């Protein structure tokens, strides 16, 4: 048998991956598919973070038996992180759910009953009853859905159609509200369009990298490996890392900066001031491409209106701004001097100045990266805007090696939550429900009566919790997330609503998570390559995969669940007479027929799917539903700088970065020569704005919603670790990953521990104004907080750190600040 170099690489990687996962591959021939019982290989994007690494999935006898990094993927070039290497094992936890479970007592549904196996028909029977009762008694605002940045593109699109077009409810929001909403609003305010203008190719072009609240070494390790290579093979390259505590990314930092929580706002205004004072402004760029505006201040903290902080705010939730001049902006940032910034932030002056010099030096190509440290912030939108300010002042934007780049944490937070528009205020391709023209476009595309989509923004994630608690949201479907563990302020604002007898909660999940066990009905869900899918990663790259194995037992995909459930509702049951009268041909039809089996979605026959190719959903519905939904969805953005390639193209390539025009992807947006939507001769055009100009915002420092005081004397920051992803519902079922980091710990400065009589390994009670949790003291290891701050990951279901966190949000993005609340510690005596 003769092997090519590529086949040899694939074979070696397959053997290594299989061995690491505790499996065996008898011969190299199995990896390259040359024996009768060969492993079959196919491509897919990784199931975890928003990097979008490509993997090759090895299947045999209906199971995944191996995976490896895809050497043909331009994202990861054959490399995986530790989670990626164990992808097969996330599918086969011993407690995988395989049939619907309903709380029952004496053969009937009972809110306090035990989970009992039922059929899909009976599951949909009780769902139908509860959703119809809510719609009949209170109307569309009484039903809602909490979705996911892990949904495939067509799962999110189907949910959007069912909720906003079918049930006429804008109460659809994704868990990306907790991670990317501030980035979305920041992009929209500054540029008028969402998502980064650059791409991962910037890493190999840049001279400097600045990480703002981003531990790329653990959260985006494959991108970090590319950045590490750039830094270590080019002596002039510099890396600055800013965080409220030291972490693994600090190990490569030339300028490691630990700042006082919330003072990143101060630091960015100082850098803007430094750029201006040192004549480093690109004046020609500003004159041609930038406007200046002063933003509203004292905007509150997204708490309930009765909260003292909301009552005290002068402009709660205000997104208002007014024009100003460059000279006005210069005056505004002038107060953020080096001395003042050092005092407020706790950062030495020389480090601040060194950081500012990177931005100011016209010879230095620079990329700013950020993740949750910016976004999970009560002024997260401002933080995003202020970072854009620095790139716009210097013209370091939309060009190879320079630009601001928001990294995403979920595999399709961009492709599904943002681009499809599964937020409570959005529609596809940056359209919004508050815009009449946008609603008309959606209604026309979906062949719905005019006026079907409500104009009022629906309930965002935290507002959904509050509405459940208040009894105004009564039928609620949670899909592809574990929000009971991941969301803030569990005790006060989430659990009461879920267990309220007025409400019926459905959770679709592969595993019995905290959320599933808190629900009334659990629906078993297909995972990853048990269905055909598409994700969109952080660099605007859309990637497809085919179904490669069947789902276990009676598990069904989220797409199947949404579309099948739509059959239970006739249009007369969900639309008022005036809407039905506009479309008399819809009388007697159900939402499945109107939304999913219409002449656009259903026109692609099963004959387009090879006979030997798995596609359970398509064969159940009788047409190529994924293709139909994608092509209908893609029509929203084509010709409007959100262009996607034809469906079939994506199955042949390792993803394409939109806009895709005439078969060519776009690496850098808004720059002539790279972006087909920039007219010839304009050089740069931020075409999301009517005048083609981006906006620099004057925004001040404002304090956090909650800070340490005499009683609650420590900052608490929460986050993740390398080995686990989000709430650990997948990674904790991988024995190797679980053993590597079996339980959450409380990272604390040794002197803070000593002052409280605590030692490494001690049990400690962490207490906030909202709840408490018992953890273990860790004074060493990868995370090294400064005095006055503790850090705790949220993957451990036995240590619900979100019992402690405050449900304060950015008033503009409605994204929760998981990085700043006040706690105190008590030693637990055995």
From Swiss-Prot:
Lineage: superkingdom: Bacteria
Pfam families from the UniProt entry: Molybdop_Fe4S4, Molybdopterin, Molydop_binding, TAT_signal
Keywords for the protein's UniProt record, in alphabetical order: 4Fe-4S, Electron transport, Iron, Iron-sulfur, Metal-binding, Molybdenum, Nitrate assimilation, Oxidoreductase, Periplasm, Signal, Transport
Positions of Mo-bis(molybdopterin guanine dinucleotide) binding: 83, 150, 175, 179, 212-219, 243-247, 262-264, 372, 376, 482, 508-509, 531, 558, 718-727, 802, 819
Record has RNA-binding as a keyword: no
Documented EC number(s): 1.9.6.1
Reactions performed catalytically: 2 Fe(II)-[cytochrome] + nitrate + 2 H(+) = 2 Fe(III)-[cytochrome] + nitrite + H2O
Record-level GO BP terms: cellular respiration; Mo-molybdopterin cofactor biosynthetic process; nitrate assimilation
Compartment(s) of residence: Periplasm
Known cofactor(s): [4Fe-4S] cluster; Mo-bis(molybdopterin guanine dinucleotide)
Family: Belongs to the prokaryotic molybdopterin-containing oxidoreductase family. NasA/NapA/NarB subfamily.
Quaternary organization: Component of the periplasmic nitrate reductase NapAB complex composed of NapA and NapB.
Protein name: Periplasmic nitrate reductase
Naturally occurring in which organism (per UniProt): Yersinia pestis (strain Pestoides F)
Record gene name: napA
């Amino acid at each position: 048998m003769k092997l090519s170099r590529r086949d040899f690489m694939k074979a070696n990687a397959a053997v290594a991956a299989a061995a690491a996962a505790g499996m065996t591959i008898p011969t190299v021939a199995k990896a390259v598919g040359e024996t009768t019982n060969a492993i079959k290989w196919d491509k897919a994007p990784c199931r975890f973070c928003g990097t979008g690494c490509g993997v090759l999935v090895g299947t045999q006898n209906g199971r995944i038996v191996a995976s490896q990094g895809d050497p043909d993927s331009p994202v990861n070039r054959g490399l995986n992180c530790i989670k990626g290497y164990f992808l097969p094992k996330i599918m086969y936890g011993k407690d995988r759910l395989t049939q619907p479970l309903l709380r029952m007592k004496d053969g009937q549904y009972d809110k306090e009953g035990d989970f009992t196996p039922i059929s899909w028909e009976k599951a949909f029977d009780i769902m139908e009853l509860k959703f119809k009762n809510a719609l009949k008694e209170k109307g569309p605002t009484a039903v809602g859905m909490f979705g996911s940045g892990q949904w495939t593109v067509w799962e999110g699109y189907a949910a959007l159609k069912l909720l906003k077009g079918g049930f006429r409810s804008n109460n659809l929001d994704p868990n990306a509200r907790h991670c990317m909403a501030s980035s979305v609003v920041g992009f929209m305010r500054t540029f008028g369009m969402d998502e980064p203008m650059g791409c991962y190719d910037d890493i190999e072009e840049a001279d400097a990298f600045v990480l703002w609240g981003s531990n790329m070494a653990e959260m985006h390790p494959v991108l970090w490996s590319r950045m590490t290579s750039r830094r270590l093979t080019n002596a002039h390259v510099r890396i600055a890392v800013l965080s409220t505590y030291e972490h693994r990314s600090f190990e490569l930092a030339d300028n490691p900066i630990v700042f006082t929580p919330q003072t990143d706002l101060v630091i960015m205004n100082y850098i803007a001031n430094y750029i201006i004072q040192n004549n480093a402004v690109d004046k020609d760029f500003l004159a041609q491409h930038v406007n200046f505006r002063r933003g509203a201040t004292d905007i509150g903290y997204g708490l309930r209106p009765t909260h003292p902080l909301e009552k005290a705010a002068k402009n709660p939730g205000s997104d208002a701004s007014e024009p100003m001049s460059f000279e006005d902006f210069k005056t505004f940032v002038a107060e953020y001097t080096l001395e003042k910034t050092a005092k407020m932030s706790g950062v030495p002056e020389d480090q601040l100045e060194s950081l500012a010099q990177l931005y100011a030096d016209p010879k230095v190509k620079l990329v700013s990266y950020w993740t949750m440290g910016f976004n999970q912030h009560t002024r997260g939108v401002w933080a995003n805007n202020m970072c854009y300010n620095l790139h716009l002042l210097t013209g370091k934007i939309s060009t190879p090696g320079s630009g601001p780049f928001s990294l995403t944490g979920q595999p399709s937070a961009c492709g599904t939550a943002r681009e499809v528009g599964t937020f409570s205020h959005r529609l596809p391709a940056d359209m919004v429900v508050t815009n009449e023209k946008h609603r008309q476009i959606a209604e026309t595309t979906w062949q719905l009566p005019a006026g079907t989509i409500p104009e009022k923004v629906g309930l965002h994630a935290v507002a959904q919790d509050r509405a459940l608690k208040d009894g105004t949201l009564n039928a609620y479907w949670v899909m592809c997330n574990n929000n009971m563990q991941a969301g803030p302020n569990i005790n006060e604002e989430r659990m009461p609503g879920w267990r309220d007898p007025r409400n019926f909660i459905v959770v679709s999940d592969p595993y019995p998570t905290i959320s599933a066990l808190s629900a009334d009905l659990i629906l078993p869900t297909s995972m990853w390559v048990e269905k055909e899918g598409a994700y969109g990663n952080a660099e605007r790259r859309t990637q497809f995969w085919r179904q490669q194995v069947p789902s276990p037992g009676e598990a069904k995909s989220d797409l199947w669940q949404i579309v099948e459930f739509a059959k239970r509702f006739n249009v007369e049951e969900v639309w008022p007479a005036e809407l039905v009268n506009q479309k008399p041909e819809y009388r007697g039809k159900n939402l499945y027929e109107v939304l999913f089996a219409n002449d656009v979605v259903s026109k692609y026959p099963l004959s387009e799917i090879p006979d030997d190719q798995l596609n359970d959903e398509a064969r159940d519905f009788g047409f190529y539903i994924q293709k139909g939904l994608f092509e209908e969805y893609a029509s929203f953005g084509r010709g409007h700088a959100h262009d996607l390639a034809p469906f079939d193209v994506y199955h042949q390539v390792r993803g394409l970065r939109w806009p895709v025009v005439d078969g060519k992807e776009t690496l850098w947006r808004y720059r002539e020569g790279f972006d087909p939507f920039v007219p010839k001769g304009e050089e740069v055009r931020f075409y999301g704005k009517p005048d083609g100009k981006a906006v620099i915002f004057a925004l001040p420092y404002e304090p956090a919603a909650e800070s340490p005081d005499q009683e609650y004397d420590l900052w608490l920051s929460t986050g993740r670790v390398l080995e686990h992803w989000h709430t650990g519902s997948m990674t904790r079922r991988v024995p190797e990953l679980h053993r590597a980091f079996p339980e959450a710990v409380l990272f604390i400065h040794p002197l803070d521990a000593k002052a409280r009589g605590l030692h490494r390994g001690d049990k400690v009670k962490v207490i906030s104004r909202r709840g408490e949790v018992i953890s273990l003291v860790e004074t060493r290891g990868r995370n090294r907080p400064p005095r006055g701050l503790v850090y705790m990951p949220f993957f451990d279901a036995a240590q619900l750190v979100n019992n402690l966190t405050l449900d304060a949000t950015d008033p503009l993005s409605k994204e929760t600040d998981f990085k700043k609340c006040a706690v105190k510690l008590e030693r637990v005596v055995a």
